[in-house]
Amino acid sequence: MKRCCLTLLGLFLSVTMLFSQQQYKEAFRVAYEAFPQIPSGLLEAISYANTHCHHLTDANYVSEDANAMPRAYGLMGLVENGKGYFRENLERVSQLSGYAMEDIKADPVVNVMAYAKAFAILSNEEEVKTFEDNLQVVEQLSELPMGAAKDRYPMQSMLYSVCSFLNDRSKAETFGFEPYTLDLKALFGDDLERLSAKTLLIASDSDYPQAIWDPAPECNYGERTDPVSGVVIHYTEGSYAGCISWFKNCDAQVSAHYVIRSSDGQVTQMVREADKAWHARSANAYTIGIEHEAYGNVIDFFTEAMYRSSADLVRDICSRYETIDGHRTFYRDTLDNGICLNEGLHDLGGETACIKIRGHQHYPNQSHVDPGPYWDWNYYYKLINEGTPVTRLTGEEGDLDHRFYGDDERKIWVIESSEDTKITLDFSSFDLESDYDFLWIYDGDDVYAPKLGRWNTKSPGKVVSSGNVVCLEFRSDCATNDLGWRCHWKAEKPAPPEPPVEELPIGVYPNPASDEVYVNVGESVLAEVAIYDLLGNRVLPVVRFMGSTTVNVSGLPAGIYVIHYGQATVMESVTKLVVL
């Protein structure tokens, strides 16, 4: 069942990516047609590395903070205001192409065409001959600072994303180009191990063994004086490479401990957990900040790889800090009264609050609303808390009694009965702390099965599974317990289904007949039926009816007759009728 859920998530993200590609396919086609010297797929690869092939506008940004990353625009992710750090490649593309900056920002076709024209001009100037030469042009048109050798990692990371996209067969099929066979080792040399690492690299410099260590400068973080007791979930509103580069900008005065790449979940650590990163205002002192490569209203950035990588990281953090319990991960996206806690700002308390792993939007004195409504908190909670013991019950009938429950509970029960049965859960009592303690029931053998419901303020009453397995999951917060709940469960074989009621065909039947014949004209209209002998004499009165009727023929002598039927006054259908 879990594999099914993950497959559905992957399928959904693939569909959204395909929709994005199809939506802007014409923009890329026109650009390649105008500038055939640009290798097929390269424009899409650059766009995907920067924007996941989404046309970014101001509507994709929420943060107005001065220290937020510079905004990128259009399919190609061009920066207008680099805030004195990023290169302003929107202006350069405009100058090279002759297109106005406002048109490049507003129109996806112009955005790609302007970039392609600028790329072609630079290619001619550089006398591009090899693919490596093309990558140098990509660098020239990037917003990322060129930097000294020690600061090359963000640029290399962006170029790696471009090249790995081109080598990816599934991306090639989706975006309509022949997959490349680039030798990444030849292109990136010894840097390839770090650029391609997911969870295989052991980096002794980082707190988290699977993370790449690429430190932010000391100007962008401070000394921690308070104990760590929380985790803040962010999204970048920019690319992975761009975020890493931005945290190296002393003027930004911003950083996070970790940054996670959307495509494969790669983790880069930039500030040691023992130090105070600057990511959540007053919560900096006691929290660890994790940035996820995403825009809050572009759902396909939130990949399965990124969720899993982030959950693995948080689980590792929980193992090292007694003050952070995975059960205290935020998951209450919507309350029974309709309040959505994953949209807008919701102060869930400060350092002593129950919820220890939550979004930027959930801490006091904040202006950011990340990670926003597309972040699946309930799924994230399940990933962080994988390994919870499961109580398995078998048989045809029994009781579940979970009264007087405790704090910080996560309990899971799986009930399985004999095949060809359905399980009914009948709750005789149900009393949970409003808005904080919850019961889920799933139609299958684990918490990834289809959800039958979630309950908090109202009793489930009777809940019936579709098969012979049902799963219950209960969670409580860190304080205030109510009476709990009890239910009786019983497995029963469902009653055999009623035979389907088939629509009778248009016509006359039975035929031959002895008592009655059924006449059906197939629609609810005024109709008539008349019966004649072979000499043309009407032997029964004309019967008028709506749609269908029965005619008593028991009084007719045995023999052959002719029956006329159809819409009133027309009776266009004629059938031989045999009376026994």
PLM regions and their residue ranges:
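C-terminal outer-membrane/trafficking sorting elements
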Residues: 1-6, 16, 502-509, 513-580
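N-terminal export signals and maturation junctions of secreted/periplasmic proteins
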Residues: 4-9, 13-34, 188-206
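Extracellular/periplasmic catalytic domains that process cell-envelope and extracellular macromolecules
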Residues: 37-39, 68-71, 132, 222-227, ...
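Active-site-proximal beta-strand/loop segments in catalytic clefts of secreted hydrolases
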Residues: 47-51, 79-81, 233-238, 260-263, ...
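Domain-level representation of secreted and single-pass membrane ectodomains enriched
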Residues: 389-499, 514
